[in-house]
């Protein structure tokens, strides 16, 4: 979710003209099940009440299943939108990437093979993109299951996820994949927020039964180490968190 200035570029001209020409909007990337159609948008004037933008804006072409699940996007200071997404439920060793200047016309899609060094990896789920304004580079965090790598716990071996990350300045040269967080249980759907310098919050899903809820962890560095996960702050069966500052909240 990003607060967009000067409306939503050309999409505003096509669909949001009635909302006025010089307002700020929040934007949310989304998808419809079974996730083979492609990228969808929602917009809001206040961050609380949302409406959909009609249409599909990028059809997935990558991966064994050619899906677009969990799309995550940031905009950099030059006005470029950078998008990452899940390409398959299982079998792929990377995530999808594309960029755009106007949210309508997108670059060629690329598979970023972040788990190619771990050929037994079950999946690469829910990549979340973060722009590090201090290091002037992107960080992408995702969940993968590497059977036998971590203590099994109550989840079966092929559902025992941990959180990994890479950094890159251009999605051409990619850093070594590293483990970001092992909370001691299967975890997915992490998103990271910078509240201030040396103050980072990670919201993640505890994917173990019967939890299936959201927790938080804290760090003074983007790449950690992060604190032990908190107690859950949601009911069970909640996932896919997004965080945005709205006013003073």
Please name every model-derived segment.
Residues 1-8:
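Bacterial N-terminal signal peptides that target proteins for export
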Residues 18-249:
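Carbohydrate-active catalytic/glycan-binding domains of CAZyme proteins
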Residues 9-17:
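Bacterial N-terminal signal peptides
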């Amino acid at each position: 979710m990003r607060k967009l200035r000067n409306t939503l570029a050309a999409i505003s001209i096509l669909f949001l003209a009635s909302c006025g020409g010089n307002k700020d909007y929040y934007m949310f990337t989304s998808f419809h099940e079974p996730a083979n159609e492609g990228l969808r948008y929602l917009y809001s004037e206040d961050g609380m009440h949302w409406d959909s933008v009609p249409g599909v804006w990028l059809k997935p072409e990558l991966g064994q299943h050619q899906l677009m699940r969990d799309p995550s996007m940031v905009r950099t200071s030059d006005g470029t939108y950078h998008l990452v997404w899940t390409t398959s439920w299982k079998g792929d060793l990377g995530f999808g990437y594309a960029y755009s200047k106007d949210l309508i016309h997108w670059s060629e899609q690329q598979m970023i093979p972040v788990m190619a060094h771990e050929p037994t990896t079950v999946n690469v789920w829910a990549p979340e993109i973060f722009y590090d304004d201090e290091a002037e580079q992107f960080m992408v965090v995702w969940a993968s299951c590497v059977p036998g790598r971590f203590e099994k716990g109550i989840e079966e071996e092929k559902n025992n996820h941990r959180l990994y990350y890479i950094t890159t300045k251009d999605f051409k040269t990619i850093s070594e994949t590293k483990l970001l967080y092992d909370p001691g249980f299967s975890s997915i759907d992490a998103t990271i927020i910078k509240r201030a310098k040396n103050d980072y919050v990670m919201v993640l899903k505890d994917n173990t039964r019967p939890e299936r809820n959201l927790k938080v962890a804290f760090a003074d560095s983007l790449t950690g180490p992060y604190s032990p996960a908190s107690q859950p702050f949601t009911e069970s069966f909640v996932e896919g968190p997004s965080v945005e500052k709205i006013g003073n909240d």
